[in-house]
Each structure stands twice: as C-alpha cells, then as structure tokens.
Amino acid sequence: MPRTRTPLAAIVLAAGKGTRMKSNKAKVLHEVAGRPLAYYPVKRALELGASPVVVVVGHQAEAVEAALSAALPEAPLRFAVQEQQLGTAHAVLAAKRALRGYRGPVLILSGDTPLLRAETLEAVVSAGRRARAAVSLATMTLEVPRGYGRVVRDARGRPARIVEEKDATEAERAVREVNAGLYCVDAELLWKKLAKVGTANAQREFYLTDLVPMAAQAGGVAGVEVPAEEASGVNDRVELSRANRVMVGRLAEAFMRAGVTIEDPARFDCDEGVEIGADAVIEPNVRLRGRTRVGARTRVGVGAVITDGVLADGVTVNPYTVISEAQVAEGAILGPFSRLRPGADIGPEAHVGNFVEVKKSRLGKGAKANHLAYLGDAEIGAGANIGAGTITCNYDGERKNPTRIGEGAFIGSDSILVAPIEIGAGAYVAAGSTLTDPVPAGALALGRARQVTKEGWVAQRQAEKQMKGTATGPASARKGRPAARRAS
C-alpha cells in the first residue's frame, strides 16, 4: 500500500473497558492472530503514512501503552490519556495536546476494528480530498443494524447527521446504513467544532457524531461505504473469535498466493508476523506463533505447535512436535512427538525423534537422538548418536551444569550422564551406564554393575516354594489324618 504524500495524522480510540468482553483485561488488549486488537488500526494508519499516530488510552492505560510500544517499537506513536470515559468526542479531545501545531487531515479510528485494510482508510481520506469536504466518514450497510448509529442523508444524498440508536425515532431505526466509526477531519475544524459538542442525548455523553451536522453546514460531508466485515467492531468473545478466524484466513490466503501449500486453511492457525517460505507444506491443525519463520521446502506435520521458532529450508517437522524459541538448520528431521525448548539449536541433517526433549542444547551436523531422551545444557558433536533413554543430569539442585559430547561419540541406551561431564570424540558409552567422570576420546566407558547369571535358579526356586507349601499344609494333614477328597 503506497503511503500518502500529503500530511496525515491519526487518532486511535482505545480507552474503553469493554464490559461485554466480561474480562479483567482491557478490550483492546484481547488478541486477534497474536496481536492486541488496537495494534491493527494503529498499524494500518502507519501503513498509510500517518505521523504521528496518537493512541487515546484510559482503562488499563499503562498496559495498553506497553503492549503497543512493544509491538511497534519504531513507530511514531504518542499516547494521550482520557481519565474519564465521557464519550467519543471527549476521547478525541484528549488527543488535542499531542497534536499541537499539526495542520492537515486527521484520521480517527476505533481501537477495536482489527479487520480494517489500509486501502479502506485510503478511500476515506481520498473521498474528503476529492469532494473538498470538511469531513469524510465511512458507512456500512447491515441486515440487522442493532446497536449502531444510523446515517441520515440530505436531499442530495450526502450524510447530514448520525443518530445513535438510543436517540433514534422508529423511522430512523429502520435505516440500515450505519456509522462505521471511521472519520477523516481537518484538524482546525476538528478542534473548533468539538468545543461545541454537548451532552443532549440519551446517554449524556459527548458524541463525536455530533461533528457531522456541524461539518455539513461548514463545508459538507463525504460518505464512503466500506465492507461491513472490515469496519465492524469487536465487542464480545464471539466477535473476537470471528475476527480472529477472518484474520487468520487472510494470512493463509496470502501465504498460499506466495507459493505455500496449506492443506486445510480452515484448520490452520498463525499469528500476524509469521513468515513461511515458498514450497513449504503446512498440514492440518498446525499453530505458528509469535515471530516464527518457516523456511522454503519445509514440511510441518499435523498438530505441530511452533512459537518463536526459526526453521531453515528443507526441515521436516513430523506430527505433534512442539517448538519454543529454538532454531533448526537445513535438512533436520524432528518428531513425531519431540519437544524443543528455548535455546535448542538443531544442526543440519540432525535427527530429534519421538519423545526427545532438548533444552538449551546444540546438536551438530548429523547428530541423532531418535527416541526417549532428555538433552539439557548440552553440546553434542557432529555425527554423535544418543541412544534411547539417555538423560543428561544437568541440574544439581542449585545450578545447571553442561554436558559435552564429542563428534562421532556413541551413547548407549539408558545412559545417565551426570553433569558437568565430557565425552570425547569417538568414545563409546555402554548401555545402562551412569557416568560421573570424563571419558577420553576413543575410549569405552562402562558405569554399571557387572551382570551375574545364576543357572538353574528358576527350577531351584520353584522346588523351594513347593517344599515350603508342603511344610505349611493343613493341620489335619500334618497330624496324619486322612485328607479330604474331592468328588470326581
């Protein structure tokens, strides 16, 4: 989306509590595709070239400010506080100081409209310029317009006023064209007219919509109809879920058009900001979170969950693998049912198999841990083999200790490596060993008790049991009385 070449500022209204969410968290902090609701209108305004963007905060102001600053650290954001939520006009007035000295159009958006596209904002801004109107506003047509302010047009078909539902007559309530809550207003007119807005309405609030009849007299109002899906706000958990599904659907479509195979878009879930390379294949029920990057030709299997993971080209992620803050090099094979925890670094062509957990450890090229192992705080050399059931005992109750396994080393099944410990290159560790001392390169280490085999033990034990049973038989039998016979 090309940025506008003329000055443009924006105000995003994000002060409300959102009581219908029934949450202790401010409404605009609830997430769609991994981002706070307010992130999206702010980002769209930035994409259009708005600078500055003033976010009006109120309920949980510090949390909202922190979330947006973290999500958009380089953006020209300013924050204004609306101490009391007295209406939309009052909220816009709270931004006046932050825009002191600015002259030009001001885009005003609601913080709970995540589905707005930058093209839609551009249409609203451009409509005002083309019509030389003091105000341009977005409208939408709804089959059931309950809860929205109705747009009343004049004889020439231009927006003349907006009537909130609680103040509307029966005839006005029948109107299906409603206010979308998106405006572009000249800054000078905005501050001048807002000072005249009163509270003569059913809610006793300062309505921003009162600006429309004032602007109609001052220089006209341009109306732009926009898709209802984009402009509808999120007010409860049902609408939040719908918005999330639409946003994820848009992301899936963009990936597919860029050469990614998503086998079932309806069962695909990802966050805004995820990257996927061409010819990657994403199987059903995969979840990609945070800043995850999936390389070209990588295949992610059913049920995998990846959060802030970096996967190179040609990686195979088998079903139900969980990856968090880890990186995987080209050609590596993971899973099924493997877990990479923060700090895991899997080298090229390495294998991490089923029920293997890796934390803060690096596997070199071609290293393999194919089954049932825990590798924590470990450095594993290229070509090393980690047998099933191997554990690095990295925690001594006070600190984490490292394990180093050299290139080409072979660790037998069910081995316990008590850190800190180092296994040299090419060394062998016998299955079932518990090791506490270093193993030199090329050596064989055995850390288990010697096997003892007792031939004939089973027969001897059975004979002893039989003799014991005879010695402890019924008292009558021991006294020489005839034993009772069973009828045949």
UniProtKB/Swiss-Prot annotation:
Keywords: Acyltransferase, Cell shape, Cell wall biogenesis/degradation, Cytoplasm, Magnesium, Metal-binding, Multifunctional enzyme, Nucleotidyltransferase, Peptidoglycan synthesis, Repeat, Transferase. Residues 259-488 are annotated as: N-acetyltransferase. Its cofactor is Mg(2+). Acetyl-CoA binds at residues 388, 394-395, 413, 431, 448. The keyword Glycosyltransferase does not apply. Residues 478-488 have a biased composition (Basic residues). This is Bifunctional protein GlmU. It comes from Anaeromyxobacter dehalogenans (strain 2CP-1 / ATCC BAA-258). The gene is glmU.
